[in-house]
Amino acid sequence: SSDSGKTEITWWAFPVFTQEKTGDGVGTYEKSIIAAFEKANPDVKVKLETIDFKSGPEKITTAIEAGTAPDVLFDAPGRIIQYGKNGKLADLNDLFTDDFVKDVNNENIVKASKAGDKAYMYPISSAPFYMAMNKKMLEEAGVANLVKEGWTTDDFEKVLKALKAKGYTPGSLFSSGQGGDQGTRA
């Protein structure tokens, strides 16, 4: 609580890709969410603290282990779910109403928010991950048949080795920035 009589909650967030496009700086996206939340909840004040990708993960872990974590944290599923599994986070199942799940309209996003039957993460956004391949190269290397739904890590390794044997460099990673793609933080 703050001196104003309002309940104060603290929100830690990493920068998101939309901030790079607005020119308004870090926290622009979050501030728009806070404004809407505070309007709907006039007795609550939200204090935003943006954290960076270099020191943020350690800061989060230290705070959670010390019992001084923020009230709200915007982070990647991998860390969040692990904290939940370790008993460090509140169970959010009561927020996963039938209407909410219907509104999310994606069973995988709902599943990613949970460890077992307990929700530890409330999804407010999602980002697509994809892989593109050169079909001609795969055919020349004789491994196009391995690239199919349900392919395994072993299949993927076979594809990489076959491409390399044909003289191709079998891999590329595009990273616009840590705030815009998870590939650099996963």
Per-region residue spans from a language model:
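Conserved N-terminal structural module of periplasmic/extracytoplasmic solute-binding proteins
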Residues: 1-82, 101, 145
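Stable alpha-helical elements in mature extracytoplasmic
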Residues: 25-33, 56, 60, 76-79, ...
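Class I S-adenosyl-L-methionine
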Residues: 31, 35-38, 84, 93, ...
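Helix-loop-helix "hinge/cap" segment bordering the ligand-binding cleft or interdomain interface
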Residues: 39, 97, 113-180
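Short beta-strand elements of ligand-binding domains
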Residues: 73-76, 92-95, 124
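Short beta-strand-centered segments that line the small-molecule binding cleft or hinge
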Residues: 80-110
